[in-house]
């Protein structure tokens, strides 16, 4: 068994748990977690959250105290601009989500996270997660890879917004994430692509012709 922070965790049947659990699968894509590390990591995802469509997972000005794993459902992250809401990202089944700047800096969030459908999530407390990161190098490596992937995605998106036409941005998104057009309302996609809804509708219509 493994003893850590007054927890005693048996390691029997860890193999079957790993094979079935998508959280462990995602971490193992980035780092070679041992069975003990996998078991410990999984034991802290204890908070279950259920959201209805339009419910908020995180609100602006509130501190982000959790990292979430989406079991089912679709959510959007948006910035509450005075003139209009600016969609900055979306998350789906089997992915992680949080108000990232707030989670990392331990400061109030500037963003809202809202359910676009019925959602079921698991959550780990921020303090518990960073204890794991600080005490287990394999978990720290996986977290670093997740952060690096997010940073690369942000840079690539910024370049697309600055250099591509609205039509080209649409085509890139369709190629990269075709599922978004089935899961997310068109007005939010238009906001994410920094284009008018009418332009998005026109490009969508043109794509269907081809």
Each model region followed by its residue ranges:
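Cyclic nucleotide-binding regulatory module and flanking cytosolic helices
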Residues: 5, 10, 14-48
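Phosphate-/nucleic-acid-contacting segments
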Residues: 9-10, 164-210
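A cytosolic small-molecule/anion-sensing beta-strand core signal
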Residues: 52, 71-72, 92, 117
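Short beta-strand segments in beta-sandwich/barrel cores
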Residues: 56, 74-79, 96, 120-121
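Short phosphate-coordinating micro-motif centered on Lys-Gly-acidic
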Residues: 57-62
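Glycine- and acidic-residue-biased ligand/ion/polar-headgroup-sensing regions
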Residues: 65, 69-76, 94
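Cyclic-nucleotide recognition modules
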Residues: 86-145
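Short, Lys/Arg-enriched N-terminal segment that forms or immediately precedes the first helix
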Residues: 150-159
């Amino acid at each position: 068994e493994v003893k850590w922070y007054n927890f005693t965790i048996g390691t029997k049947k860890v193999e079957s748990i790993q094979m079935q659990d998508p959280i462990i699968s995602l971490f193992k894509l980035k780092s070679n977690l041992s069975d003990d590390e996998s078991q410990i990591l999984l034991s802290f995802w204890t908070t279950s959250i259920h959201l209805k469509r339009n419910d908020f997972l995180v609100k602006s000005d509130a501190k982000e105290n959790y990292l979430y794993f989406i079991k089912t459902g679709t959510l959007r992250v948006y910035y509450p601009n005075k003139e209009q809401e600016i969609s900055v990202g979306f998350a789906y089944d089997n992915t992680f989500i949080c108000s990232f700047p707030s989670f990392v800096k331990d400061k109030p969030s500037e963003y809202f996270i809202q359910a676009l459908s019925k959602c079921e999530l698991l959550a780990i407390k921020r303090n518990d997660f960073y204890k794991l990161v600080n005490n287990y190098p394999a978990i720290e490596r996986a977290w670093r890879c997740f952060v690096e992937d997010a940073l690369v995605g942000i840079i690539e998106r910024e370049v697309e917004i600055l250099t591509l036409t609205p039509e080209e941005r649409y085509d890139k998104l369709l190629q990269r994430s075709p599922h978004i057009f089935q899961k997310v309302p068109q007005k939010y996609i238009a906001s994410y692509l920094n284009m008018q809804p009418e332009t998005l509708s026109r490009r969508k219509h043109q794509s269907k012709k081809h």
